[in-house]
Amino acid sequence: MKHVAVLGGGPAGSHAAECMARAGLRVTLLDEKLAWEKPCGGGITFKAYDKYPFLRDNGAPKQFVHQTWLGAHGAGRVKMDLNQPLIIYSRRDLNQLLLDRAERAGAQLEKTRVLGFERLEHGWDIRTREGVLRADFCVVATGARNPLREAGTAWKPADTMVALGYFVDSRQEHIDIQFLEELEGYIWVFPRSGHLSVGICGKGESARQLRARLERYMEQNGIPIKDSRFYAHVLPSLERQSWRDNRVSGDGWLAVGDSAGFVDPITGEGLYYAIRSGDLAAQCVLDETTAPEAKPAAYRALTDRDFARDLYLGSMIARNVYMGRFLFDTVPARMIHFIRRSPRFRALMQDLFAGTQDYETLRERLFRNLNGTLQEVMLSFFCRRVVPELSNP
């Protein structure tokens, strides 16, 4: 394999291009915009920067956040310190960081729009505005709105969620997360370098309904809408059956990041999975022990073992996390109560924010700690409400 074309220059495509170019392959990365400000919170978890330290150790503008406030209807708000900080980037700055790394590794970057591609007996003809590029193999990294319907995940409307919001000229040091009544989604306020990203993501409601919810929240919390720049985007949020049928690879191509549907169905977080899938795609392409015709199956097996099975498990519980009930209240409200009163549950939530708690072992951990959590909640309630002087020795 002599020449690989990477179709898309977001985090997934950029990192795949870097890894392959660094190993000596000829790599051409094609993207219409290259670095641009994508509507996204821009959060990098400990799980991501622990595996890929360059996400932490670089000169790009970024914000280290050590504290979050979480709220839910009927439960108020609670402060939670993060054991491991979240790193928040402007997506333009993050994309530029990754593109620069790819270019330094030897990848050729071309700012052009991919109009389509055609499978040949040996390789691909890729049509762009400037002409036709021939490549031996393709890595598809064209994002959630993938225009290349022949490759990448083939999702249905139910497999997406709307994300929209505002870039606000304001500052704060912490993250805000607000769960809303009857919504499979949440509002976020992320501090970036120089501004806030204030947004909402959710399933089952129109963009107009979500925008109304967000603007009501902003007005209630004194966050200015006037002169703030609006953004909107579609995120993959695959349903359970769609994970089973997900099309992540095919004859001569591998899909990475959003174009493969690799986004957490509960949190909407996709940056770790973008970079990780780019890494795994590069490993698969570079593996000389795997024949070209066997690479699609090998890549699917790699992603399944590494993270895709866990995302599938997340899709099985996503609706209950937002819309379910537990102990006569909503699950989000109970989460707030438990964070406030139970050190065990608070530690679990800190691990979820760090990305170190997977969904496969989440149920077991919850049930293993349930008795202790409830005891802590009751003891906290007793000390603070029944005998308040005990909580203030």
Residue ranges and their predicted role:
Residues A12, A35, R145:
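Conserved Rossmann-like nucleotide-cofactor binding loop
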